[in-house]
């Protein structure tokens, strides 16, 4: 998501309706939704654009642990420019994430399930079983046009489909 936000700066932006000013953020600060016994908290991964995938994974684990153990500090909860919520952690396939103003967008990650899909193998259509995941994206239409939203999601989809996450995570 950090890579996609760098590639699509209007999604990593905010709009102030009082001043009618748009702010394009140079830092990608991603809030992650964490389910805790006291309710949902959204700690922030600051400057995610400068982190490797293993560093981001480590930050997610650390922030989630701090959130669940009531150890977050005020700085851990401020400065988000975008939010990611994992609706799939409870098995949900679809949801409509609610935008957190002044952020321009929030991305949901649904449950990953095997699905039959049509693939092209050697010029022939075939049915294959693939891991599939819906990525519901809610955005502020004052900041992000529908076509831009589509390009942003396509960037994420392409990264998910072509990445070697085992190598990226050094597994």
PLM features: residue spans?
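C-terminal catalytic/motor cores of large multi-domain enzyme assemblies
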Residues: 1-171
């Amino acid at each position: 998501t950090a890579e996609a936000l760098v590639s699509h700066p209007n999604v990593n932006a905010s709009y102030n309706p009082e001043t009618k000013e748009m702010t394009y953020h140079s830092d990608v600060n991603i809030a992650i939704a964490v389910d805790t016994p006291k309710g949902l908290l959204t700690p922030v991964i600051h400057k995610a654009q400068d982190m490797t995938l293993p560093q981001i994974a480590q930050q997610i684990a650390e922030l989630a642990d701090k959130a669940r153990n009531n150890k977050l500090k005020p700085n851990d909860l401020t400065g988000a420019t975008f939010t990611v919520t994992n609706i799939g952690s409870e098995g949900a396939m679809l949801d409509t994430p609610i935008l957190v103003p002044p952020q321009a967008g929030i991305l949901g990650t649904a449950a990953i399930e095997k699905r039959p899909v049509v693939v092209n193998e050697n010029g022939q259509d075939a049915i294959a079983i693939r891991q599939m995941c819906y990525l519901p994206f809610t955005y502020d239409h004052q900041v992000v046009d529908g076509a831009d939203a589509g390009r942003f999601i396509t960037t994420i989809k392409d990264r998910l489909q072509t990445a070697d996450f085992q190598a990226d995570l050094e597994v």
